[in-house]
Regions:
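Transmembrane catalytic cores of multi-pass membrane glycosyltransferases
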Residues: 32-94, 102, 151, 201-289
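Membrane-interfacial entry segments at the cytosolic side of transmembrane helices
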Residues: 12-15, 182-189, 224-238
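Transmembrane-helix motifs of polytopic, lipid-linked glycan transferases
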Residues: 102-128, 166
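Short hydrophobic alpha-helices at membrane interfaces in multi-pass membrane enzymes
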Residues: 173-198
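Membrane-interface micro-motifs in multi-pass membrane enzymes
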Residues: 128-175, 204
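Structural signal for the C-terminal ends of transmembrane alpha-helices
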Residues: 32-33, 114-122, 140-141, 169-179, ...
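Hydrophobic core segments of transmembrane alpha-helices in multi-pass, intramembrane catalytic enzymes
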Residues: 104, 108, 156-167, 210-218
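Start-transfer (signal-anchor) and selected internal transmembrane alpha helices
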Residues: 1-29
Length: 289
């Protein structure tokens, strides 16, 4: 019996060591990639006090956090509502890029671990699954460097996704055996979940809406399985709705639409995407035949 237990423990230790080694390897690889790429395109704009995407006159360099807050008010009014991501974007311009390289590599590593957590929760350690997730995290992404390595995009997509998946952990770990928390703890957790939900919904237009849908599906699942729905589950959803509303109601969204010449008719957009889908499907069918 003891020898069997020792064997199980040894296997667990080996698997945990393998997980740590894989995560460390991914961190190191992405750190190298981050170090090979400098700033580009919109990155330079955010080194200065934000007055709009069209620079007029001589731009003034950021001098501190106060300049960032002032710029984000302008950003919300004339560009878009992605304030948390762009606040961090400007904040990291105050440091050497090596700081961003390290933190961004950590976020890439965390993304893989969080996906693994959600996919493998309450199951034995699955090393092949973790390897597949990290491989697909890069190979399955269209232009991965544009989402993970490019300075401006990393804040908007990589970092926000990590935050959302972390927020959703509090729905994933819920089960029927969980004891009802003390009222004082539930109040604190409810407030924290509301705040976390606001920032999860206030990420970007695609992921904010997806997060709201994911939380709703969790609550529906809890109801079907007759699992208790706690107050913090509800306040989390209210937070996501609030954050998503702040994002969508930004005056800058309307300003950007007014400054573009793209078609605004939603039906024409849907028909255009339908035609593209039919074309791609036809090409794939021909290739299969």
């Amino acid at each position: 019996m003891n020898s069997q237990k020792l064997t199980v423990n040894r296997e667990t230790v080996i698997k945990i060591t393998a997980v740590v080694a894989i995560a460390a390897l991914m961190f190191s690889l992405i750190l190298v990639f981050n170090g090979m790429i400098g700033y580009a395109a919109d990155d330079y704009l955010y080194f200065f006090k934000y007055t709009g995407h069209v620079v007029k006159g001589t731009p003034e360099r950021l001098t501190g956090i106060r300049d960032i807050f002032t710029g984000m008010v302008t950003h919300y009014k004339i560009c878009n509502g992605r304030i948390p991501a762009h606040f961090l974007l400007q904040l990291f311009t105050l440091f050497d890029k090596s700081v961003f390289n390290v933190v961004n590599s950590l976020f890439f590593t965390l993304l893989g671990l969080l996906i693994y957590f959600h996919a493998n929760y309450k199951r034995p350690i699955n090393i092949p699954l973790l390897v597949f997730i990290y491989a697909f995290e890069w190979l399955g992404m269209n232009k991965p460097a544009s989402a993970y390595i490019w300075y401006s995009a990393a804040f908007n997509y990589l970092w926000t996704t990590v935050w959302i998946l972390t927020f959703l952990m509090f729905y994933r770990i819920h089960d029927t055996e969980s004891e009802k928390p003390k009222p004082s703890k539930e109040i604190i957790l409810s407030v924290l979940m509301f705040v976390a939900g606001v920032f999860a919904g206030w990420t970007n237009e695609n992921m904010g809406g997806a997060t709201m849908g994911a939380v709703m599906l969790f609550l529906i699942y809890f109801k079907i399985k007759k699992m208790p729905i706690r107050a913090h589950h509800v306040t989390g959803l209210l937070g996501v709705i609030t954050g998503f509303g702040i994002l969508l109601l930004a005056p800058g969204n309307r300003v950007r639409i007014d400054n573009t010449h793209r078609e605004r008719n939603i039906m024409k957009h849907l028909l255009w995407w339908r035609s593209r889908y039919i074309l791609i499907s036809g090409v794939l069918c021909c290739l299969c035949l």
